[in-house]
């Protein structure tokens, strides 16, 4: 199972059920369980990371706030944003947490290069940036030597809700999205992202599914 990957395309989903399913998957996986990546668009929601502070929620209005157990601070998820959850056995891949973060940042940087978008990571604030404007947020959790949670890449969405928070705890952090820089569809970006992931983490066999994880 070391070099096998299952990619689940889950479509549009509320945040909490997917978060709970990640927990169930991670709790029940063992050394023979293949790694999975879940691709999803969430209905509008603010999620607070473990380091999140209430003062970074400025005016959430009618958008719900969920306290999550990922790393990092507050962010926004909504339609038109590609969320990728990485359910990876780090011990099997011989990866440390910092290495995985770097791999994920590089994954996004390489994906954006396909669309002639130059981007970079920042040592002081995880994620990916285009000229100091944030295009991708990142937050992970590790349990039993396995990762869950992942990245949120802004593709073609309403960025206004980010003005209701201090994104990732940074007041005035400007957000940007792929469609501001290059016309593209969610499906195109998903395809490139998975191709880059397979190359970066050396997966040899990839299977796709549209079924949600069912632990029963």
Swiss-Prot record:
Binding site for substrate: 70-77, 137-139, 150-152
The BPL/LPL catalytic domain, residue ranges: 31-205
Name of the molecule in the record: Octanoyltransferase
EC number from the UniProt entry: 2.3.1.181
GO CC annotations on file: cytoplasm
The entry's keywords: Acyltransferase, Cytoplasm, Transferase
PROSITE patterns assigned to the protein according to its UniProt record, in alphabetical order: BPL_LPL_CATALYTIC (PS51733), LIPB (PS01313)
Enzyme class: transferase
Any single GO BP term: protein modification process
């Amino acid at each position: 199972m070391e070099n096998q990957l299952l990619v689940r395309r889950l479509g549009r989903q509320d945040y909490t059920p997917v978060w709970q399913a990640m927990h169930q998957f991670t709790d029940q996986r063992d050394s023979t369980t293949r790694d999975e990546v879940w691709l999803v668009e969430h209905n509008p929601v603010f999620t607070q990371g473990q380091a999140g502070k209430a003062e970074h929620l400025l005016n959430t209005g009618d958008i719900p706030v969920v306290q999550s157990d990922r790393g990092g601070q507050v962010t926004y998820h909504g339609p038109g944003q590609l969320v990728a959850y990485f359910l990876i056995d780090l011990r099997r891949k011989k990866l440390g947490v910092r290495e995985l973060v770097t791999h994920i940042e590089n994954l996004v940087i390489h994906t954006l290069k396909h669309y002639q978008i130059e981007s970079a990571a920042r040592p002081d604030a995880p994620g990916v940036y285009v000229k100091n404007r944030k295009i991708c947020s990142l937050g992970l959790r590790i349990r039993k030597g396995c990762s869950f949670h992942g990245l949120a890449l802004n593709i073609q969405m309403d960025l206004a809700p980010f003005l209701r928070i201090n994104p990732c705890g940074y007041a005035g952090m400007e957000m940007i999205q792929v469609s501001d820089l290059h016309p593209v569809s969610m499906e195109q970006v998903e395809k490139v992202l998975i191709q880059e992931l397979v190359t970066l983490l050396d997966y040899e066999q990839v299977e796709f599914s549209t079924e949600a994880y069912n632990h029963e």
